[in-house]
């Protein structure tokens, strides 16, 4: 089974905010493949499972706050015996412009607290990621930026990035090597 974890903050107050980019990508996959509703798991997450192009896939959204994402991801990886090659984390990235998508097979957190938490709990930096750009704030604080919504001008670029992230994930689900996909999508 492949597991795709979208990072975000749970609660309607955070819906459609930049920091919930990961949630928005997995929500789009769930809608497009008619996987049904996300249900609560005991591992501090909501998830939906199904078959996408012949492959069993679980889409996950931690119900912890972003900074504690590892509390959900670690137990899920253990419980479902997920090989790290079969795990992808989808997260927002301040260091990339809105509309940009980048795939990585390993690396540091880049200052992303959700990734820091996952790295700490898993004990490794070696797991696949799909990073979606949300850009640095032009004005105001980083916190207000990541917890804010995309502007009318940004939204079409963001929607295109979600679609591109979804295509990359579909290619990976279909058996494409993640490292090779980096060349195609980065």
Curated annotation (Swiss-Prot):
Gene Ontology CC annotations of this record: cytoplasm
Site-annotated residues for Stabilizes the basic form of H active site to accept a proton: 92
Residues engaged in binding tRNA: 14, 65, 67, 113
Chief subcellular location: cytoplasm
Family classification: Belongs to the PTH family.
GO biological process: protein quality control for misfolded or incompletely synthesized proteins; rescue of stalled ribosome
Subunit structure: Monomer.
Reaction equations catalysed: an N-acyl-L-alpha-aminoacyl-tRNA + H2O = an N-acyl-L-amino acid + a tRNA + H(+)
Domain of life: Bacteria
PANTHER family for this protein: PEPTIDYL-TRNA HYDROLASE (PTHR17224:SF1)
Active site annotation, chain numbering: 19 (proton acceptor)
Protein role: Hydrolyzes ribosome-free peptidyl-tRNAs (with 1 or more amino acids incorporated), which drop off the ribosome during protein synthesis, or as a result of ribosome stalling.
NCBIfam families: pth
The keyword Methyltransferase is assigned to this record: no
Site location (Discriminates between blocked and unblocked aminoacyl-tRNA): 9
PROSITE patterns membership: PEPT_TRNA_HYDROL_1
Gene this protein is translated from: pth
Gene Ontology molecular function: peptidyl-tRNA hydrolase activity; tRNA binding
tRNA-binding found in the keyword field: yes
TM segment ranges: none
Record Pfam families: Pept_tRNA_hydro
Name of the molecule in the record: Peptidyl-tRNA hydrolase
Subcellular location: Cytoplasm
E.C. no: 3.1.1.29
